[in-house]
Swiss-Prot record:
It comes from Rattus norvegicus. GO terms for biological process: cell surface receptor signaling pathway via JAK-STAT; cellular response to hormone stimulus; cytokine-mediated signaling pathway; growth hormone receptor signaling pathway; intracellular signal transduction; lactation; mammary gland alveolus development; negative regulation of growth hormone receptor signaling pathway. Substrate-recognition component of the ECS(SOCS2) complex, composed of SOCS2, CUL5, ELOB, ELOC and RNF7/RBX2. Interacts with IGF1R. Interacts with DCUN1D1. Substrate-recognition component of a cullin-5-RING E3 ubiquitin-protein ligase complex (ECS complex, also named CRL5 complex), which mediates the ubiquitination and subsequent proteasomal degradation of target proteins, such as EPOR and GHR. Specifically recognizes and binds phosphorylated proteins via its SH2 domain, promoting their ubiquitination. The ECS(SOCS2) complex acts as a key regulator of growth hormone receptor (GHR) levels by mediating ubiquitination and degradation of GHR, following GHR phosphorylation by JAK2. Residues 151-197 form the SOCS box domain. This is Suppressor of cytokine signaling 2. Residues 48-156 form the SH2 domain. Ubiquitinated; mediated by AREL1 and leading to its subsequent proteasomal degradation. Ubiquitination is dependent on its phosphorylation at Ser-52, by PKC. Ubiquitination is stimulated by LPS.
Length: 198
């Protein structure tokens, strides 16, 4: 998945790329820059965002990983911000994520694009497809007609996540109502900073 800015001008991706790394207070940012900054903050909390990495480096990291293992890295293509690299039965591959009108979605052929679900963040998109793969995958299935099945099942972490983060993931898998838990407000705030299961 590669994050792509769909703007008609040739410099739209460059402008979006510069906004992706924009720091500063939310009051100083345009709405689009604020959305991108929030998406980057969420992505940075995952532990599976690798930042700057080449295609070959991603392939090397995923070479011995089980099928379904994935990571997100910066795209080396100037029209895109991010790429998800995933291990398939045929080896590592890369997929695109498009960014348009404040939404993220998988890149696809034109006739399918309008049917693809859109998300407010990259992490929400990944979380959705990981959960969908858990629901659909019952075991190894032989590809038909040369088709390679793509499963997102397990992130490849840059380093071991903290115990706090693993606990947060476990709680998110068990409940969607954090505010109703008998926990201190500060802990509820921490849990709500990252509402995803992956």
């Amino acid at each position: 998945m590669t994050l792509r800015c769909l703007e008609p001008s040739g410099n739209g991706a460059d402008r979006t790329r510069s906004q992706w790394g924009t720091a500063g207070s939310p009051e100083d940012q345009s709405p689009e820059a604020a959305r991108l900054a929030k998406a980057l903050r969420e992505l940075s909390q995952t532990g599976w965002y690798w930042g700057s990495m080449t295609v070959n480096e991603a392939k090397e990291k995923l070479k011995e990983a089980p099928e379904g293992t994935f990571l997100i890295r910066d795209s080396s293509h100037s029209d895109y911000l991010l790429t998800i690299s995933v291990k398939t039965s045929a080896g590592p591959t890369n997929l695109r994520i498009e960014y348009q009108d404040g939404k993220f979605r998988l890149d696809s052929i034109i006739c399918v694009k309008s049917k693809l679900k859109q998300f407010d963040s990259v992490v929400h998109l990944i979380d959705y497809y990981v959960q969908m793969c858990k629901d659909k995958r019952t075991g190894p299935e032989a590809p038909r007609n040369g088709t390679v099945h793509l499963y997102l099942t397990k992130p490849l972490y840059t380093s071991a996540p903290t115990l706090q983060h693993f606990c947060r993931l476990s709680i998110n898998k068990c409940t969607g109502t954090i505010r109703g838990l008998p926990l201190p407000t500060r802990l509820k705030d921490y849990l709500e900073e990252y509402k995803f299961q992956v």
